[in-house]
Amino acid sequence: MAELPRERMDQVLKRFELIETQMAAGPSPDAYVKLASEYSELQEVANSIRALRKAEAELEDLDTMLADKSIDREIRELAEIDREEVESRVEDMQQKLQVLLLPKDEADEKNAILEIRAGTGGDEAALFAGDLFRMYERYASERGWRVEVVSASEGEAGGYKEIIASVTGRGVFSRLKFESGVHRVQRVPATEAQGRIHTSAATVAVLPEAEDIDVDIKPEDIRIDTMRASGAGGQHVNTTDSAVRITHLPTGIMVVSAEKSQHQNRARAMQILRARLFDMERSRAANERSEARRLQVGTGDRSERIRTYNFPQGRVTDHRINLTLYKLDRVMEGELDEVIDALIADHQSKLLAAEGAES
């Protein structure tokens, strides 16, 4: 295990103790809100540092006792048992702190824009895109998040050719960001008379929702066009007679929104445009960092096949971490935590390896 950054631990603890003092001094309401937010961010790591230091002091006391040759044999045996237990506890605490002290992704606490597009497979791909959207809807509901459809183009046989939604709630992006990529399904379509298994795919993109302060969009860099809305006529389309299309001229990114009012159209389209530009900048910065240290960690390449859903076998396989679960029905019902937790653990282990390589 890599050496803990003791100097950084000191800085975190000093900052946390300063915040505790400032909050107790009765600051203004605005200042208190900011302090409380930072307090919440640092509380777990600060408490872990304090607990580790207490356990390390206990271990040092036991070592001092065991170094005394004159102590009674029975007391020595008890002290040795205590030392093993405390040493194990210290190692566990150190591993936990290694993870807590990893560099934070500034986007982790942001809301997200979820985009799902049917890929190869025609009607079956659109149906699968619909299944994926419902899976994420159920997962969001379990976590108390809110899902709001921004735009949708329905498939001719059901499902979606494309659906875009905003997902809001605590820690949304931190949980969903590893879902970006190509999702593949293997199953027998309802229209397949011979019972043959078909393979189709859908692409998922999860973008952190950007604020105005995250992305500076100059008025002269965008073109706004109003046009008639079009779609398959489902519940999420044709809610207004016209739609707004915003084109970001420097990048060529185009966003279309068909909300119930022109004001909502423009606001929604700008929300998605900001998210896409923010994601583009994050990807560029991540690629530069990866190139610099020659190690890629969780790039979320959307051309990468990340997961296969095999219905005949009731199997879900995440190819990035070689995880296979035989609980497809439950996963499709939104029970994604086991998969997402494994992906986060894998990501953290890669970050730890990168930190060790750089230290």
Swiss-Prot record:
Disulfide bonds: none annotated. GO terms for molecular function: translation release factor activity, codon specific. Methylated by PrmC. Methylation increases the termination efficiency of RF1. Keywords: Cytoplasm, Methylation, Protein biosynthesis. GO terms for cellular component: cytoplasm. It is found in: Cytoplasm. SUPFAM superfamilies: Release factor (SSF75620). Gene3D superfamilies: 3.30.160.20, 3.30.70.1660, 6.10.140.1950. The modification N5-methylglutamine is found at Q235. InterPro entries: PCRF, Pep_chain_release_fac_I, Pep_chain_release_fac_I_sf, Prokaryotic/Mito_RF, RF-1. Belongs to the prokaryotic/mitochondrial release factor family. Peptide chain release factor 1 directs the termination of translation in response to the peptide chain termination codons UAG and UAA. This is Peptide chain release factor 1. The lineage of its organism: Bacteria, Pseudomonadati, Pseudomonadota, Alphaproteobacteria, Hyphomicrobiales. The gene is prfA.
